[in-house]
């Protein structure tokens, strides 16, 4: 998804009723992605920690909580590595687009439970307290103080990152990339999109088959699931 976004493309059409992956430009992005593995020899299933600590893989892409893994499992290279923005795409004006696909985590209230107990307002107040900058910052600092480097906690907001226990050398980078993050739209049926793209990728790389054909034949599964879910919720579909 990062490669799609860096090239200015969107995963779904304007009203989120179908995927745009059937467009030639987006298919070429998928093809370029798979060719890192089929043509340039990258491995798609490796033990990143082991390969990184030995120098076999000098550069890897992951979420910032991977700092924990390296700090604990590879102490012998402590201070010899750092983090940076994801590799970007050069634009026509010479600038580099570092847009990175972001994962979404949520907190929620089970309404049927709290309404039954008459605790709706209290549940909402708790959720606001838990996700507040002060609570998240304090929790991350106290957790790290109690359990050490392994307890680095992915806090719920930017202010908590700024005030939390993340090392300054990492904090500066993490804060600088926040404006580059772009989340995948969460639409009815979208859970199948990532799964389908991943399956097409694995098939292409494992069987060394044509990436565009492999992706194309899977698109009906995405659009059909989106249509079915939108019909289930009484929403308009791409066919209307």
Model region roles, listed by residue range:
Residues 102, 168-222, 227:
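C-terminal capping/gating helix-and-loop segments adjacent to ligand/active sites or protein-protein/ligand interfaces
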Residues 1-16, 96-112, 193-202:
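Periplasmic solute-binding protein
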Residues 64-78:
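A ligand-binding cleft/hinge motif common to bilobed small-molecule-binding domains
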Residues 31, 35-41, 74-147:
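Extracytoplasmic/periplasmic substrate-recognition and gating elements
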Residues 15-45:
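Glycine-centered hinge/linker elements that transmit conformational signals in sensory
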Residues 58-63, 82-84:
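Paired acidic/hydrophobic, glycine-rich loop segments that form the ligand-binding mouth/hinge
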Residues 46-60, 199, 203-207:
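Short helices/loops that flank or line small-molecule/ion binding pockets
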Residues 223-240:
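Short, low-complexity disordered leader/linker segments with a strong preference
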């Amino acid at each position: 998804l990062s490669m799609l976004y860096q090239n200015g493309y969107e995963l779904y059409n304007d009203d989120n009723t179908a995927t745009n992956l059937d467009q030639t430009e987006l298919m070429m992005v998928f093809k370029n992605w798979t060719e890192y593995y089929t043509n340039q020899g990258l491995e798609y299933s490796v033990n990143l920690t082991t390969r990184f600590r030995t120098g076999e893989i000098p550069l890897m892409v992951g979420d910032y909580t991977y700092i924990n893994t390296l700090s604990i499992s590879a102490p012998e290279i402590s201070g010899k590595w750092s983090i940076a923005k994801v590799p970007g795409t050069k634009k026509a004006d010479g600038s580099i687009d570092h847009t990175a696909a972001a994962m979404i985590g949520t907190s929620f209230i089970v309404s049927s439970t709290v309404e039954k107990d008459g605790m709706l307002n209290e549940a909402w107040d708790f959720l606001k307290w838990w996700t507040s900058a002060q609570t998240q910052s304090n929790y991350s600092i106290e957790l790290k103080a109690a359990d050490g480097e392994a307890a680095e906690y992915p806090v719920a907001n930017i202010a908590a990152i700024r005030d939390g226990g993340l090392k300054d050398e990492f904090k500066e980078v993490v804060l600088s990339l926040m404006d580059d993050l772009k989340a995948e739209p969460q639409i009815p049926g979208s859970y199948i999109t990532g799964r389908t793209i991943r399956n097409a990728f694995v098939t292409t790389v494992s069987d060394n088959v044509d990436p565009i054909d492999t992706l194309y034949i899977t698109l009906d599964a995405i659009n059909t699931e989106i249509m079915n879910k939108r019909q289930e919720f009484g929403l308009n579909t791409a066919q209307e």
